[in-house]
């Protein structure tokens, strides 16, 4: 059970030595109380919590698991490099190999820099854009998440107004709003940040409209600002290239993280020659940015991305899950809103403004051995098989029945209600 003996003990111990018992996106504070906080192991598309309760995992570690947990070829590549060395006095030659492989796969890229987390990559892109242009203003979509750094975090504790004084906002997918933002900050825009599609928590996802993407490219070309696609979350889950490739739009910079080393800690900033001099001139670094083991894992992950039908597998599994859920929702009379790419689904219920239905459904799915999320977009991996989807749909069908059975007594999450009233 999610609240088994080991889980309870770990939560109690964590409360004493970790602020809040857990922090950041890994905290289960906003999830249903049944959700486990601690996990013991993972393999393929499955995770086991601290009490060895198994789940088919549709969060994939919030994205990093692309090809399956502990994928054998990637683990072998990482193990081989680990025997040679990981964090050393200087980088391994494998860093050059990885840069060559990455640049060879991403059409707009002429060079690569590596770091650890998505926030590292986006903050480096911000600094680079200001160095390249000599300007201050960064344009971001309202509500967009580009990491946890002070200039962009959605939270306010410890953040000063001055941290964001040179960040301005536009409405995602609204070409006119973007054009107006350029006019309002004429002559001082260093970069426009855009996610490949709208993928914020507690919101329906929205695919990028061509007019919006073209306007972003046009405004940057006309003003000398840099176009930055933040592909940290979506990278390699919608394309084998930058996620705006299908729109025919190439950015100047793209930010990558999460899955290109299949869970090993590494992120990247890729750029065109236009921004090479600025990339050379800025100073960004980290003690573990040059670790060789994640780079070895990344090289093998990129090889699998190039050479296998992993993406087609992702899309097919996502489509099968989406179709099955839609059929179940109609049969049970509980309308779903499924948005975004099927392999990165966001699932909400219609007429559920305080998310009480979605939370109850997610908790019922968990009881049935399926880990879904009530407010964050989810992720499929190439390890999700047809049998996994079939087993998932059996559990989700039971979850629909449980929600209907308990419908009159469903209550919203108390912390969500506190936040809504704040």
UniProtKB/Swiss-Prot annotation:
Q: What is its EC number?
A: 2.6.1.-
What subcellular compartments does it reside in? Cytoplasm
Per the record, the major location class is cytoplasm
Q: Which reaction does it catalyse?
A: (2S,3S,5R,10R,12S,14S,15R,16R)-2-amino-12,16-dimethylicosane-3,5,10,14,15-pentol + pyruvate = (3S,5R,10R,12S,14S,15R,16R)-3,5,10,14,15-pentahydroxy-12,16-dimethylicosan-2-one + L-alanine
Q: How does activity depend on temperature?
A: Optimum temperature is 35 degrees Celsius.
Task: State if Oxidoreductase is listed as a keyword.
Answer: no
Q: Which UniProt keywords apply?
A: Cytoplasm, Pyridoxal phosphate, Transferase
Cofactor or coenzyme needed: pyridoxal 5'-phosphate
Q: N6-(pyridoxal phosphate)lysine (modified residue): where? A: 258
As for family, the record states: Belongs to the class-III pyridoxal-phosphate-dependent aminotransferase family.
| Protein name, UniProt field | Aminopentol aminotransferase
Q: Which organism is it from?
A: Sphingopyxis macrogoltabida
- What lineage, starting at the top, does this entry show? Bacteria, Pseudomonadati, Pseudomonadota, Alphaproteobacteria, Sphingomonadales
Give the gene symbol. Answer: fumI
């Amino acid at each position: 059970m999610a609240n088994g003996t080991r889980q309870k003990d770990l939560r109690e111990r964590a409360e004493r030595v970790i602020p809040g018992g857990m922090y950041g996106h890994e905290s289960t504070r906003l999830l249903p109380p049944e959700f486990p906080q601690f996990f013991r192991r993972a393999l393929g598309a499955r995770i086991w919590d601290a009490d060895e309760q198994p789940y088919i995992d549709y969060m994939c570690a919030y994205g990093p698991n692309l090809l399956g947990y502990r994928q054998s070829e990637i683990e072998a590549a990482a193990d081989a490099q680990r025997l040679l060395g990981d964090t050393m006095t200087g980088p391994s030659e494998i860093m050059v190999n990885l840069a060559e492989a990455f640049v060879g796969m991403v059409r707009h890229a002429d060079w690569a820099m590596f770091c650890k987390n998505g926030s590292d990559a986006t903050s480096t892109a911000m600094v680079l854009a200001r160095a390249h242009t000599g300007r201050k203003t960064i344009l971001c979509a309202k509500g967009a998440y580009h990491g946890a750094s002070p200039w962009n975090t959605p939270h306010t504790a410890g953040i000063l107004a001055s941290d964001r004084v040179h960040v301005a906002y536009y409405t995602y997918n609204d070409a006119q709003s973007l054009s107006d933002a350029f006019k309002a900050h004429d002559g001082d825009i260093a970069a426009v940040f855009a996610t490949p599609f709208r993928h914020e928590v507690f919101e329906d996802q929205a695919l990028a409209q061509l007019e919006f993407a073209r306007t972003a490219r046009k405004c940057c070309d006309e003003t000398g600002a840099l176009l930055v696609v933040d592909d940290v979350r979506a990278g390699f889950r919608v394309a084998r290239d930058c996620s705006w490739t299908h729109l025919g739009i190439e950015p100047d910079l793209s930010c990558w993280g999460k899955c290109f080393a299949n869970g090993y800690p590494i992120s990247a900033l890729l750029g065109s020659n236009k921004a090479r001099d600025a990339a050379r001139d800025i100073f960004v670094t980290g003690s573990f940015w040059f670790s060789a083991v994640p780079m070895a894992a990344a090289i093998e992950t990129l090889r699998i991305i190039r050479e296998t039908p992993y993406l087609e597998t992702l899309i097919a599994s996502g489509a099968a899950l989406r179709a099955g859920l839609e059929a179940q929702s109609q049969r049970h009379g509980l309308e779903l809103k499924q948005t975004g790419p099927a392999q990165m689904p966001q699932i909400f219920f219609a007429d559920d403004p305080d998310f009480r239905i979605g939370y109850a459904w997610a908790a019922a799915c968990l009881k049935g051995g399926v880990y879904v999320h009530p407010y964050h977009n989810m992720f499929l991996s190439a390890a999700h098989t047809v049998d996994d989807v079939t087993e998932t749909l059996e559990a989700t069908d039971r979850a629909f029945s449980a929600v209907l059975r308990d419908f009159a007594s469903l209550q919203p999450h108390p912390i969500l209600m506190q936040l809504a009233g704040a």
